[in-house]
Amino acid sequence: MANDSMKKELVAHKVYSAWQFITYTEKNIGTVQYCADTINNIIGKMTMKTVRWQQDIFADFVDDITENGKKVKRVSVTTENSPVFEVRVAGEKVDPWFLFDKLLRDFFQYTMNAFDSMSQIINAGLLANKGKKVDSVDIQKMITTFNQQTYSTAFPKMQMWLNKIAQSQEFQYIEAINNRTKHTADIANKLSMGILGSSNTTEIGPFFRKDVQHDKIELSDQLQATLDFLNNSWNEFLTVFQEEYVKDAYTENRKHSISGVHQQKLKGEPDQDLSYAYISADTTFDAMPEELYILLVNESENGVYAHECPFDTILVTGTNKENILGRYCADDVIGDDCLLHYRKYVKDKTVTGDICSK
């Protein structure tokens, strides 16, 4: 559902800044899948190594006789002839237990990142002009925000989805294990290879956090359960999001372009050169909105291109672009960044007319 058609719809509804977070969510989900696949590949390679070691060790059986005269075959397993496990990353030997532990932590961290990215989509695509600062947004922030009557009334389906996620045991486990391993300490996970008839052991260890006991669980079961939960949640989210953003609840006074940039050069007087970005008014300056939200977007057959609006001041002109009526001033500062947002401009009522260009 996250395709070029949806991208164009976001442009039409003036919430295009949400698209960057849609692609980032999919990137996070892809990373989660990669972690799971690589963990399984590590276990598979270690298992294969163990099987081959056992085949080799069986060739070393020696004949022996027990005390009661029974003929037997014996084999000796020591640290010197035990299997050696290692994997290569970028040509370097890496301890598989280290890689297993890192990838397992990454698996849950990127799962949480995916849900936080979904919250950024909500912030940019639904809250829009009422959105929170991007650096303060995460899934818990959106859960709290959408439990407020204003937003639960405006977007009831999204509120239901958020509460469903918050109340899910699967999400609560993901959040708990991520916070434990990210901020507190390791968990006693187990990865051991069975030899001579015994089975492999692959477990996520038990842990106790915020008065809740989380029991040990078979690794493969939890990996698959988390993947299923994440993918199902994402599909449900996209359905709900598409039903909600078309309401255009908080997208007033958004623009994807300005009228142009006027440049005026005076021959022999370079210090008097004049250049300014402007918007042509269809009405009086007084009748224009108090705020504008601008993201420069160009839609063509080759795709959609967007850029932050770099102008700190935008003048308002009449039908003649040299007839200056007033100005808007940027309400926030932008830096050198790839993040896109609808930059807020506030009407400056302190000056009007040509003095605005000074």
Model-predicted segments: where are they?
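Acidic, Ser/Thr/Gly/Pro-rich intrinsically disordered interaction regions
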Residues: 1-109, 119-358
